[in-house]
């Protein structure tokens, strides 16, 4: 039986890291991805397949998808979007560029990644997209405005995608 392949973003620590190891132990072909080369090397040394990918870089995303599809021979069972980061501080003190950076990682990068894997999933007639957002996409917290906003946007985007698929 062929192993099911799952691509997980944001695996350098936390939920992505833990899920990657747990799914690997359950005999999934896990392809992890991280932004930093040192994290990629660390995960590889732990026995996981890991590729470098930066959600703020369109070329990096495209290369990561191409490498993922090569590794799984075009048969991707699931995409687990988890990679994100959060800025703290009052909204009135937040420069527009900082807000744009937050959305580049937490919304636009996820959008591009999903748009690039969907054709493969459609071709194979199946696929799953798991979006690990945050409770802060439903209930705001002060001094987390940039993160809150990106997660609220992601929740709306994900609900719309679900309806369209």
Regions found by a protein language model. Name each.
Residues 92, 139-145:
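Active-site loop immediately N-terminal to the catalytic Tyr-X3-Lys motif
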């Amino acid at each position: 039986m062929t192993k099911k392949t799952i691509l997980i973003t944001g695996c350098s620590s936390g939920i992505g890291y833990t899920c990657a190891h747990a799914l690997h132990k359950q005999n999934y072909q896990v392809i992890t991805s991280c932004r930093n080369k040192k994290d990629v090397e660390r995960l590889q040394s732990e026995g996981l397949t890991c590729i470098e990918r930066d959600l703020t870089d369109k070329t990096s995303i495209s290369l990561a998808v191409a490498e993922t599809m090569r590794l799984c021979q075009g048969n991707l069972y699931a995409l687990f979007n988890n990679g994100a980061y959060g800025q703290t501080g009052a909204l009135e003190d937040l420069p527009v560029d900082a807000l744009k950076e937050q959305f580049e990682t937490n919304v636009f990068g996820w959008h591009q990644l999903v748009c690039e894997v969907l054709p493969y999933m459609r071709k194979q007639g199946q696929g799953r997209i798991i979006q690990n957002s945050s409770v802060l996409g439903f209930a705001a917290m002060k001094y987390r405005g940039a993160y809150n906003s990106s997660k609220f946007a992601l929740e709306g985007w994900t609900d719309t995608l679900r309806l369209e698929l």
